[in-house]
Structure formats: structure tokens, C-alpha cells
């Protein structure tokens, strides 16, 4: 299978460690082709240590008279937040790109992030990058923390190993 970055990726079944998850940030920012977000210059982010994916559903609820006191609900919106931690690695294109966004605002923080799961599934996310922390203790390695926040609807592609 070929991923969004145009690379061939081998997939296997079974249980996997988190380090088997591949991810990339588009260092060219967010680009659109025919109204679709398309990555132009995807790069890995070297020395990333942690990746946590959260999905938030906007839920509307109401209490109809015929519900006999029971609440009804409907998920009307979704968003994805990916929280990441990394060591600052100067000279790595992905790491430098993220660190370079720490003082940026507005559309300068738009990008495209894609995740390739070990089973071959791929999640492509038009996003906003929010750098939340740089630095650390005097004897620690320079740290970097950031969030990838979905900006519009992501694309989910089932991989060849998916059921």
C-alpha cells in the first residue's frame, strides 16, 4: 500500500507497540488542491516520545415529553486532538518546523498531519499546530510539547490489513 506521503509501507497483523505508528507533518503548511487538503512536503518529527489521540464529540441533548424523563442525545460534531511530546532536535526538518511555529499565529499555524497505523489504516488531518512548551530543567534534554488540532474533516483510509 502507498500512504499519503507516497511511500510504500509494510503492514502486519497482531498487537503492536506505539512506536509502530508512523506520522508526518507537512512542513509546507496546509495546501489545497480542488478544495481537498493535500500534503506537499511531509516529514517525520524525529525524537517524538509520545502521541495521544483524543476524539471529542459535540453532543446535543434534549428531554422530550414522550421520553418519560429519559434524555435523548445526538452527536452533532467531532474534533480530533493529538497531544505530542518530543525532544528538541535541531536540524531535523519536522522537528524544526514544529519548533518554528511557537510564536506564529493565524493561518501560519495551519498544516497537514497524517498517521499510519500498524494495520495499514491511515488518518490524514488538516490541522492547526499549537506549540505548548519548549525547554525544561537545566540538566534535562531540551523538550518540546505540541498539539495537532483538527481543522475541518479528516480523511480515514482503511488499510489492506484492516478487517
Tell where the protein language model's regions lie, with residue ranges:
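Short acidic, S/G/P-rich loop/turn micro-motifs used as interaction or catalytic elements
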Residues: 91
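Intrinsically disordered, low-complexity terminal/linker regions enriched in Pro/Ser/Gly
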Residues: 160-163
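Hydrophobic alpha-helical segments of small multi-pass membrane proteins
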Residues: 105-111, 131-132, 147-149
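Generic macromolecular interface patches on structured domains
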Residues: 94, 157-158
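Hydrophobic lipid-interacting interfaces of membrane-associated proteins
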Residues: 151-156
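Short, acidic/charged, Gly/Pro-enriched secondary-structure junctions
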Residues: 94-126
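Solvent-exposed edge beta-strands and adjacent loop segments
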Residues: 2-88, 126-147
Amino acid at each position: 500500500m502507498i500512504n499519503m506521503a507516497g511511500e510504500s509501507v509494510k503492514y502486519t497483523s497482531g498487537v503492536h507497540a506505539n512506536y509502530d505508528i508512523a506520522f508526518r507533518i507537512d512542513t509546507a503548511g496546509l495546501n489545497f488542491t480542488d478544495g481537498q487538503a493535500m500534503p506537499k512536503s511531509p516529514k517525520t518529527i524525529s525524537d517524538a516520545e509520545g502521541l495521544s489521540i483524543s476524539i471529542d464529540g459535540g453532543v446535543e441533548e434534549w428531554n422530550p415529553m414522550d421520553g418519560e424523563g429519559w434524555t435523548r442525545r445526538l452527536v452533532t460534531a467531532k474534533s480530533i486532538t493529538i497531544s505530542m511530546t518530543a525532544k528538541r532536535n535541531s536540524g531535523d526538518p519536522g522537528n524544526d518546523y514544529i519548533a518554528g511555529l511557537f510564536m506564529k499565529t493565524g493561518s501560519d499555524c495551519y498544516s497537514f498531519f497524517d498517521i499510519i497505523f500498524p494495520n495499514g489504516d491511515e488518518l490524514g488531518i488538516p490541522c492547526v499546530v499549537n506549540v505548548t512548551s519548549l525547554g525544561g530543567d537545566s540538566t534535562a534534554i531540551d523538550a518540546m510539547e505540541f498539539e495537532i488540532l483538527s481543522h475541518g474533516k479528516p480523511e480515514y483510509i482503511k488499510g489492506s490489513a484492516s478487517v
